[in-house]
Amino acid sequence: MISPDVGGGFGYKGILAPEEVCLGWLAMNCNHPVRWIEDRRELLVANANCREHSYKVTAYANAKGRILGVEGEATVDAGAYSAYPFSSCLEGEQVVSILPGPYIIPSYSCKAYSVATNKAPLLPYRGVARTGECFAME
């Protein structure tokens, strides 16, 4: 396989797509060069996606408005399967660890669920889970 240097190793560039495996197999077994051309629209529709989250966040504060505690629950659409080499649980794990953000919260708990669906696989992009959790917390 010949792939030009595109820099980085995250997002779509960091995974092994099923089509790439099939192309290698075809080329070796057909003893013939195989070319795969995919436009941007096809890639974005059929390849891995991310950031389809659902949040339930409850904040507890005293009479002066100081936050005393936060309870969170997140459901992450993980798609039909993991995008190798990443786990479909990565987004949910990040939500749990970064939901409080920069705030000092004396009591914090959060549950995250990665749910398998019939959609394209989940792929962590730059800023894994941060878009949804920042929106939910604020």
Residue ranges of model-derived segments:
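Structural alpha/beta core scaffold segments of enzyme domains
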Residues: 1-138
